[in-house]
Amino acid sequence: MKNSVRLALVASMAALPLMVPSAQAQQASAMTFFVTSAGSGKGADLGGLEGADRHCQQLAQAAGSNGKTWHAYLSTQGSGAVNAKDRIGKGPWQNAKGDVIASDVTDLHSANNKISKQTAITEKSTPINGRGDTPNTHDILTGSQPDGTAFAAGEDRTCKNWTSSGEGAAMVGHHDRTGLDDSAAAKSWNASHPSRGQGGGCSQDALKGTGGAGLFYCFAAN
């Protein structure tokens, strides 16, 4: 009897390591939203929308999410401008832990969305540093206005449509909904302020200088 109990305990303990990856795989499979755990390494030069989407796809698949089409939440300007809100599907979207951040596009761009430092996590379920952390990386690239639409042509807000790592500027949002004051912009997840820096606001150093790391949001479009 004692031996059978011991064997049962040993068997159950041996199964624990197998259960953890299984649970993680299930979470990754259900994930439809994340913040990239790493940027391109070239500042806001993401290789255009195509390169940004590819980065989302690669990170998601590496985390165990298959069968989904991932798009970066980024707008472009000028001829053929693209609105970020039009390229991310219909929702709902949830993070790798199962927290629903919005039910649809309208909800996402309303005060009701649930994006916060606790929910805007990476594809690996890890948190992103925010204001007060070292280093602060809460500036998330979007190139978008608060309603998810593109800026008019003229003043650069997309680092030359995500192809510049020098001149230009990109609109960023604060994933932790925290800034220098209590203004709506400071608390905006997608339209807080333009990047800036000597020689332009699109280099990796420029993005770091204002509290960023070249990260961006990814959404499952299907």
Regions found by a protein language model. Give the residues of each.
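Short, functionally important structural connectors and interaction interfaces within domains
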Residues: 10-11, 41
